[in-house]
A protein has these predicted regions:
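Ligand-binding pockets and gating/stacking loops
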Residues: 1-243
Length: 243
């Protein structure tokens, strides 16, 4: 079985390889435990009368545990080279989920419309901060795993952001986007980059695909590559905004 195969592998492995294997199996057990805990919390969680009337899909409940388990699986899949691409959507722009586990008993979509209802801003900020915390969790998890001469984080690219800029105005321009990970040393991090004119979001996607050697010349509405992403690119620093 799997246990016998892993034991045989341990016996054959060198000391450094055994350390990697131990880290892998420890991570795997952590994922198993988190999934079991998420299931248990999902069965045992109690909700108030208002939430009890909602469609189960709209109650976040143990969303935190489920998201962490998914992120752990993504990290393990990258580390073992089971896949080199993953996508994880924490919420969509029309999300009706109630983040009850954080004390927010209103729809995410409702609190995103705050121009004429400032009272919902604390709830909206809390949800956005929680989403950002999941990115931080993913990054820190990837930094703990050795990958070649660096870490898994050093050799990966993480694109994080939203498909909409402002909930009230449904703005689709100047999207908030964070690019993390070293991309194997190809990406110049620690900057806030603004472009002098609008660029299709597809240009960013195409540029990242090219950095990863993906065989593509176009994606979505792309019109070309986006300058300034790679540390090797010729990019005028006048377009950089650190404020």
């Amino acid at each position: 079985g799997v246990k016998d195969a892993s034991s045989a592998l341990f016996r054959k492995a060198s000391s450094p390889d055994r350390q990697v294997l131990e880290q892998y199996f420890d991570s795997l057990r952590d994922v198993e435990r988190s999934i079991e805990q998420a299931r248990a919390n999902g069965r045992e969680a109690s909700v108030d009368a208002k939430l009890a009337k909602l469609d189960p899909a709209l109650k976040a409940g143990n969303l935190g545990e489920r998201i962490r388990a998914m992120l752990d699986l993504i990290v393990l899949a990258f580390w073992t080279d089971s896949t080199r691409v993953a996508s994880c959507m924490l919420a969509n722009t029309n999300s009706r989920i109630h983040y009850d586990f954080m004390g927010v008993n209103a729809e995410f979509h409702y609190v995103s419309h705050h121009v004429r209802n400032k009272k919902v801003l604390p709830a909206y900020d809390s949800i956005n901060a929680w989403h950002t915390g999941q990115l931080c969790y993913l990054i820190e998890k990837m930094k703990t795993l050795q990958d070649g001469s660096g870490t898994l984080y050093d050799n990966s690219l993480i694109l994080w952001g939203s498909g909409i800029k402002h909930g009230d105005y449904h703005s689709l321009t100047d999207l908030p986007v964070v690019l993390a990970g070293g991309g194997g040393g190809q990406v110049d991090l620690g900057r806030h980059v603004r472009y002098p004119e609008a660029r299709p979001f597809g240009n960013l996607l195409l540029t990242l695909m090219k950095l990863m050697k993906a065989p593509a010349d176009r994606i979505g509405d792309s019109t070309g590559l986006l300058p300034g992403i790679s540390g090797k690119a010729n990019f005028r620093r006048a377009n950089q905004d650190d404020g």
